[in-house]
Amino acid sequence: LLCKEFRTERNHPIVLAFDSGYLMREPVDGVAKLDHAINAGLLLAFMSVKAGDQVGLFGFDSRVRLYLPPLGGNAGFSRVQRRSADLDYSHEETNFTLALTDLTGRLNRRGLIVLMTDFVDTIAAELMLENVTRLAQKHLVIFVTLQDPHLQKTAAQRPERLLDVTQAVVAENFLRERAVVFEKLKRLGVHCLDVPPE
């Protein structure tokens, strides 16, 4: 009699990559996008460590601000939790080329990269797309952005004044451009999450 027991693979490197550029300073529901991202990242780190994986941390804006190589166990989570407090908002524009090239060079084995960032439009996102695509050739990448409930509400509400029409058109165009970027990333093998802040 033969019996197979299946176990979930363990000991995978997971890197939480936080963009701390000026777009992540913007508040959503009264809290900065970076703070929402850090809270979600810490929850993911806790669950990953409990599942037996290693967790690392990477913070960047115009340059790399923080790197912790992936480490497992409670010590790994404690270290990520402690050092995530060092992530701070920046007034500088994010340099995806420098940051993601640096991250790729630091990681020796294939892993999961959870990239928490934001972008404004397709033009600004072109350079980001190129670098995320290069990262996705070596690693599994999850691209995470936060939805802006006010923007979605503005695009969906029925306009009553001329100003409302203008705001709705701008909001709808912005949402459409975001959808175009997400679609490009998905075609390139990147998993995308555009999630509400809660």
Identify the role of each PLM range:
Residues 50, 54, 90-93, 109-113, ...:
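Intrinsically disordered or highly flexible coil/loop and linker segments, enriched in small
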Residues 109, 123, 127-198:
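Von Willebrand factor type A / integrin I
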Residues 34, 70, 89-93, 118-121, ...:
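Hydrophobic alpha-helical scaffolding
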Residues 1-75, 110-117, 123, 130-134, ...:
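An amphipathic, basic-hydrophobic helix/alpha-beta surface used to engage anionic
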Residues 40, 98-102, 127:
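Well-ordered alpha-helical segments embedded in enzymatic catalytic cores
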